[in-house]
């Protein structure tokens, strides 16, 4: 059966970089991976563009494709599940999509899913400012997820990361937290373990 992992986070948090890194790591581990993004061009990857079944996709590595959202997310999920038969689908919704809304779409998509895991990517560099400026939305995005990945940990001091972690614990006490640098690849393996994918 198939697993779905959606990645929430504000614009600039590093979602696309992390998606590509996760896709490559998981396919190296023998998993068939499909990534759904709003626009393949944003991924900035080289690769043969595959125009199949109305989906514009790019092959990232052996066993890992990246597809542009085609019409509705439900439709895209159905096409990918039927034609590509992935072990894992990684979804990068827009920065303004709440995980709870995406969960509803997944539930009503008529695709058989073994597990649906949601991750919020928090930009360590901008977390405090984003929390102050968009408190209600930031809180809802954090509260509704299974795993929180604090990204860009290589750019901020340890005590700052601790403060962000305390804030996250207040908003979502039951979540697992991973410290990563998507750009450097640091902590990505630990994040995969926290997701329970491998």
Task: Map each language-model feature to its residues.
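Short beta->alpha junction loops/turns
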Residues: 12, 95-96, 153-154, 183-184
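Nucleotide-state-sensitive switch-loop elements of NTP-binding domains
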Residues: 2-8, 13, 17-129, 136
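Short, conserved catalytic or adaptor-binding loops enriched in Gly and charged residues
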Residues: 49-52, 141, 167-171
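Conserved beta-strand/loop subsegment of P-loop NTPase cores
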Residues: 34, 114-122, 142-153, 171-181
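Canonical P-loop GTPase G-domain recognition
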Residues: 147, 154-198
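A general structural signal for short secondary-structure boundary/capping elements
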Residues: 4, 81-85, 135-138, 162-168, ...
């Amino acid at each position: 059966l198939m697993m779905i992992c959606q990645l929430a986070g504000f614009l600039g948090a590093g979602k696309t970089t992390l998606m590509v890194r996760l896709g490559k790591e998981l396919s190296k581990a023998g998993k068939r991976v499909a990534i759904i993004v709003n626009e393949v061009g944003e991924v900035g990857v080289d690769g043969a563009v595959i125009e199949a079944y109305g989906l514009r996709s790019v092959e990232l590595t052996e066993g890992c494709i990246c597809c542009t959202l085609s019409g509705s997310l439900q439709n895209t999920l159905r096409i990918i599940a039927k034609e590509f038969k992935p072990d894992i689908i990684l979804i990068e919704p827009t920065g303004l999509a709440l995980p709870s809304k995406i969960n509803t779409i997944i539930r009503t998509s008529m695709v058989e899913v073994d597990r649906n895991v949601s991750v919020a990517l928090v930009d360590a560099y901008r977390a405090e400012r984003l929390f102050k400026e968009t408190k209600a939305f930031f809180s809802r995005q954090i509260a509704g997820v299974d795993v929180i990945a604090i990204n860009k940990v290589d750019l901020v001091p340890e005590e700052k990361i601790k403060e962000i972690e305390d804030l996250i614990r207040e908003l979502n006490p039951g979540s697992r937290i991973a410290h990563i640098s998507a750009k450097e690849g640091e902590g990505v393996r630990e994040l995969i373990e926290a997701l329970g994918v491998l």
